[in-house]
Swiss-Prot record:
Keyword Transmembrane helix: yes
InterPro entries linked: Brnchd-chn_aa_trnsp_permease
Transmembrane segments: 14-34, 37-57, 123-143, 155-175, 189-209
Protein name: Uncharacterized membrane protein AF_1755
A Pfam family this chain is assigned to: AzlC
Membrane topology (UniProt): Multi-pass membrane protein
Location of this chain's protein in the cell: Cell membrane
Biological processes, Gene Ontology terms: L-valine transmembrane transport
Keywords: Cell membrane, Membrane, Transmembrane, Transmembrane helix, Transport
Family: Belongs to the AzlC family.
Organism: Archaeoglobus fulgidus (strain ATCC 49558 / DSM 4304 / JCM 9628 / NBRC 100126 / VC-16)
Length: 219
């Protein structure tokens, strides 16, 4: 019975991944097409999604690579430092037998769903597998399409923004009490850094400032 319960939770996680899957496929497709357009091989584009699985950071990597190798390495790292916070929250919420696997699949959208819905690690792994499969599959389709497609700039921008929009839609219902203050404080800090052309630094500063500023009233 215990085994069936774990299996059921894994399937439930897969089901909950459906909204993420629907958003990931077109964006990953765009990544595959863009990578081929910028001169990356099929293998390189696929390895980026298979081994990195980091959405916006992958776009940053392939667009910055030809300009500066250091920027292509360090900007994605800075963009992903927020996942340290995500991982610590999930680690406190769930008892993890496979922390390295769970950490690898923890994207913004997976975190937004799992922070309230995940009942155990099996659910989280199912949620992550569905999301990861969609991202890798979408990339493969984009790589196959390659440079035969002309990627309109407006379409590209809309598809990339859809990931951020999905994250907001999944996260907003969870914002209550001091979480609202954390979101507003973090957003203000991020915006200030963005206006100073320090967007990457602003992401990290916002991730740190939001929780700190939200706790000023002693809650």
């Amino acid at each position: 019975m215990h085994s069936l319960s774990k299996s059921a939770m894994f399937r439930k996680g897969l089901v909950y991944s459906f909204p993420i899957v629907m958003a990931y496929i077109p964006v990953a497709f765009t990544f595959g097409v863009l990578a081929r357009t910028l001169g990356f091989s099929e293998v390189e584009a696929m390895l980026a999604s298979l081994l990195i699985f980091a959405g916006a950071s992958q776009f940053a990597l392939i667009t910055l690579y030809s300009q500066s190798l250091l920027s292509a390495i360090f900007i994605p790292i800075f963009l992903n430092l927020r996942h340290i916070i995500y991982s610590s929250i999930i680690a406190q919420k769930l008892k993890l037998r496979f922390p390295h696997i769970s950490a690898f699949g923890l994207t913004d959208e997976v975190f937004a769903v799992s922070v309230n819905s995940a009942e155990n690690e099996r659910f989280l792994l199912g949620l992550e597998l569905g999301s990861y499969s969609a991202w890798v599959g979408g990339t493969a389709l984009g790589v196959l399409a390659g440079s035969t497609l002309i990627l309109d700039r407006d379409v590209y921008s809309a598809l990339v923004f859809s990931i951020s929009a999905l994250f907001l839609v999944l996260l907003l219902p969870n914002l209550k009490g001091r979480h609202v203050r954390a979101a507003v404080s973090g957003g203000a800090v991020a915006l200030a850094f963005h206006l100073l052309n320090l967007t990457s630094v602003g992401i990290i500063a916002a991730a740190l400032a939001g929780p700190l500023l939200s706790g000023w009233d002693g809650e």
